[in-house]
A protein has these predicted regions:
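Extended, intrinsically disordered, low-complexity segments
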Residues: 194-230
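Alpha/beta enzyme core
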Residues: 6-22, 29-151, 165-176, 181-194, ...
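Glycine-rich beta-strand-to-loop/alpha-helix junction loops that act as flexible
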Residues: 157-161
Length: 230
């Protein structure tokens, strides 16, 4: 975005336009207010207005202001009331994190802000889960989903590193519309680079790496039950 007048964004948008299936170009975790406004002048379909690094009050106020601006530019918006950061050892007990979980009041406030997609915290973390594994509060998710959908807002899930396939499908059944998958998509790519860098031509390394990403993406489309829906 910051270089060559957004050339990479324009390239991605053109590729999406020429695709044989519907594809949107999304800007994730945009935490700079000026960058959000800049993104509105580029061919993004949606922008995550991520003000979660501010206090809860500032997050809501800034989100509401930026969501309004994005909508005047025809951009869909995503936001998160707060986030739980995982570490190398993960999260020991979600009971200690009750103050960081998304509350029903916050859901209603963000729905009222005009946001299109909401990424709540109900036990999911950004980062590692640690030896205890994933511990989600399903009742909280159910009520969050009820409040959000009543206001026409869709639920997004962040923090799905190494989720079992059956858990991901259970989340889809629970009403999650969009699932952000990053690390799991790239692991085979990283492994391919580590095993082959310096051993094969650079162009071959990249081409085969892209194939690894495509294979991982196809697998996750199957897991999320989105394959064949275009």
């Amino acid at each position: 975005m910051a270089y060559s007048n957004g050339l990479l964004v324009h390239t991605a948008a053109q590729a999406a336009k020429e695709a044989t299936v519907p594809i949107s170009v999304h800007l994730d975790h945009c935490q700079d207010e000026n960058m959000v406004r800049r993104a509105c002048d580029l061919p993004f379909d949606s922008i995550m207005v991520d003000m979660s690094h501010h206090s809860k009050e500032q997050n809501l106020a800034k989100t509401q202001e930026l969501v309004s601006y994005c909508h005047t530019k025809g951009k869909a918006t995503e936001a998160e009331p707060g986030r739980i950061e995982g570490g190398e050892d993960g999260i020991s007990d979600t009971a200690d994190l009750s103050g960081l979980m998304t509350t029903y009041e916050e859901v209603q406030q963000f729905v009222d802000s005009g946001v299109d997609f909401l990424a709540p915290a109900f036990g999911n973390v950004h980062g590692e889960y640690g030896p205890r594994g994933v511990v989600l509060e399903w009742d909280r998710l159910a009520e969050i989903h009820n409040i959000a959908t009543a206001g026409g807002v869709l639920i997004v899930l962040h923090g799905v590193n190494r989720f079992p396939q059956d858990l991901t499908r259970k989340l889809v059944a629970a009403g999650v519309t969009k699932i952000n998958v990053n690390r799991d998509i790239l692991m085979d790519y990283y492994r391919h680079l580590e095993q082959n860098v310096g051993k094969i031509p650079f162009t071959q390394l990249l081409e085969e790496g892209v194939e690894k990403v495509a294979e991982s993406m196809a697998l996750h489309m199957d897991i999320c039950l989105s394959s064949g829906k275009a």
